[in-house]
Amino acid sequence: MEVRFYDSVDDALLKFAVILAKAEGKWVFCKHKERDTYEIPGGHREPGEAIADTAVRELQEETGAQDFAIKPVCAYSVTGKNRVNDTGKEMYGMLYYAEISGFDQKLHSEMEKVCLFDELPEALTYPEIQPKLVQEAGRRGYV
């Protein structure tokens, strides 16, 4: 699995948005109803949707975030087969960072619950990808 980071890429290449988020100084992770692991909020871009709108929609749906500040960090790509890429071809996404100050009590997605962690949880859904996203956001001064 290879993860690469870019200052920018052609917008048409961006297929998903992933949002590193903190609330109360802690990392925000989601637990999917069908998995025993934790993941960073995010998801696929809908046809005709701006990638920034994808990020806002996914953050709200998966975490119940109501009050937040969100900003783009960088574009990135993942090459290699994983749960959402059965071809292994390079796929591009946009990484965002959000500070959440208020949550809705009800989730509107496939997520079972939202958890706050001081450190990254050990049981990650994408252990070869998620730590690299956090590291890159830190390198760029976001965390």
Residue ranges of model-derived segments:
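Active-site-adjacent beta-strand/loop module that shapes the phosphate/pyrophosphate-binding cleft
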Residues: 76-104
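NUDIX/MutT-family hydrolases
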Residues: 95-97, 105-140
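A short coil-to-beta-strand element that immediately follows conserved catalytic motifs
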Residues: 66-75
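Acidic, metal-coordinating catalytic segment for phosphate/diphosphate chemistry
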Residues: 1-18
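Conserved hydrophobic "DFG−1" position in protein kinase catalytic cores
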Residues: 19-21, 29, 98, 116
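Short connector loops at helix/strand junctions that flank enzyme active sites
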Residues: 14-16, 22, 33-35, 40, ...
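Conserved Nudix-box catalytic region and its N-terminal flanking loop in Nudix hydrolases
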Residues: 22-61
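Short helix-loop capping/hinge motifs at secondary-structure junctions, enriched
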Residues: 27-28, 101-107
